UniProtKB/Swiss-Prot annotation:
IGPS catalyzes the conversion of PRFAR and glutamine to IGP, AICAR and glutamate. The HisF subunit catalyzes the cyclization activity that produces IGP and AICAR from PRFAR using the ammonia provided by the HisH subunit. It holds the Pfam family His_biosynth. It is found in: Cytoplasm. This is Imidazole glycerol phosphate synthase subunit HisF. CDD domains: HisF (cd04731). It comes from Vibrio cholerae serotype O1 (strain ATCC 39315 / El Tor Inaba N16961). SUPFAM superfamilies: Ribulose-phoshate binding barrel (SSF51366). Its EC number is 4.3.2.10.
Amino acid sequence: MLAKRIIPCLDVRDGQVVKGVQFRNHEIIGDIVPLAKRYAEEGADELVFYDITASSDGRVVDKSWVARVAEVIDIPFCVAGGIKSAQDAARILEFGADKVSINSPALANPQLITDLADRFGVQCIVVGIDSYFDKETGQYQVYQFTGDESRTRATQWQTCDWVQEVQKRGAGEIVLNMMNQDGVRNGYDLEQLNLVRSVCRVPLIASGGAGAMEHFAQAFTQANVDGALAASVFHKQIINIGELKQYLKQQGIEVRR
């Protein structure tokens, strides 16, 4: 069995790490590079950086901090934000990122997934999916431009349909951002994860809702995800990554040292 991955997520806006609740009301957490270094030293398996307003602002992620991060950490990291072409992705990978993640641009142009997978290999291409549970319809719906409250909108895609579509087009990994749980810290949406897991054949990363160590264990044991992504519990030092891995080992879950 492959070891499960623990992945801190750093939302970036205006060159700083920020964190919101349910994708709103972001507060500044701190500078990018020291946080990245701290997480690498604590034992994170990889890091994910989202330039959260790049797509809605119509620009590509700022590459200057990508290079600075690459200099100070020795674990893989993934970068997302406004990547609309193979050229955009190439620049970010050249600056030191190991993977690129696309979300809103893939919804606007699904062919982009295939173009990137063909050029860089599926192992480099992550698709982020922002999924919102609509209580009225009882459906999980994919949302777009979630980095900017004023531009966030529902798409025509239901989550499981989009998961299947992006796999067909060459996604090497899927990060499922569960919007209703984001920043609330009351646990991952296990029901949704199981639903997506049933149609997802590539590595699946859970995102949104981690508040305690047992939430990570539940995602791994009850939904069989490959990795668990979290932000506020790490930023606010509610959970230490080294201690989390120790706890998971005690639960019989295989993690990397």
